[in-house]
């Protein structure tokens, strides 16, 4: 069993071409990816279903069922670099008049020697950048929110032939 991994060394990639319909893994793999530079933080993503409940007179316990799933709204925080190609793509999709979905690829640094890393693929609309305030010791940052419109596709590590 592999040792546990931290987020250090993980990478975020984006695609400049809009992806407005659900994709399968092979379609994501075929896209042209641009790495986003100076990523400092990636927010939560993944299936988060609503929990619907209904009380009936004949049941002593509230009855529950899953409802609609939210794929997530992760924030991508970057140290602002005006000419970073990945950040430029994020800014382009973040324009309030841009209603297209952007494809995103998140690669963990967890495969180890002789293996690929875990990869997540998804797509969604982008909001931002938000420019956080701060003081004299704070970096100039930008935050983008990705409203995912497809459940992430997880690709586990495999042995490199």
What is each model feature region?
Residues 59-122, 154-161:
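Extracellular/virion structural assembly segments
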Residues 12-14, 104, 146:
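Hydrophobic beta-strand residues in large extracellular and virion-surface proteins
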Residues 15, 37-40, 79, 107, ...:
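A structural detector for beta-sheet-dominated domains
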Residues 107-154:
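Short beta-strand and beta-hairpin "edge-sheet" elements
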